[in-house]
Amino acid sequence: MRRKILVIDDNTTQCKVIKELFESCGYSVVALDSPEEALYLLEWKEFDVIITDLSMPWMNGVEFCRRLRNTRPETLIYALSGYIYKFDRNELLEAGFDGIFSKPIRIDLLKDAIEEDLKKSRMVG
């Protein structure tokens, strides 16, 4: 079974790069540029992993994560930001993020974290 990843970033180039990299690793990936669109999609579609930018114009990643945690506590959620220093790490973890990564992304580190967390969730679930 292919694992499903949802990528949310208002930078469409960034979305495309992440999508292509994870697809090349065998994941099924949907990329969106709007957290509102993602919340709508999540009403009827399930994902194993969500990767979201923190700084988006319509809704920031922290608000998105908090809203999602109310309905999808089991979904792995990772934060990305080119301005990670602007965010309080404890606030991000309290919001429910499973991992926090700075841009430019080291895709190998992100992929390793996701695969490790998916293994852990399979053992627990």
Give the label of every model feature segment.
Residues E63, I84-I100, D112:
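Alpha4 helix (beta4-alpha4-beta5 surface) of REC/receiver domains from two-component response regulators
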Residues D33-E37, N60-F64:
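Acidic catalytic/metal-coordinating carboxylates
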Residues I105-I114:
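C-terminal output helix
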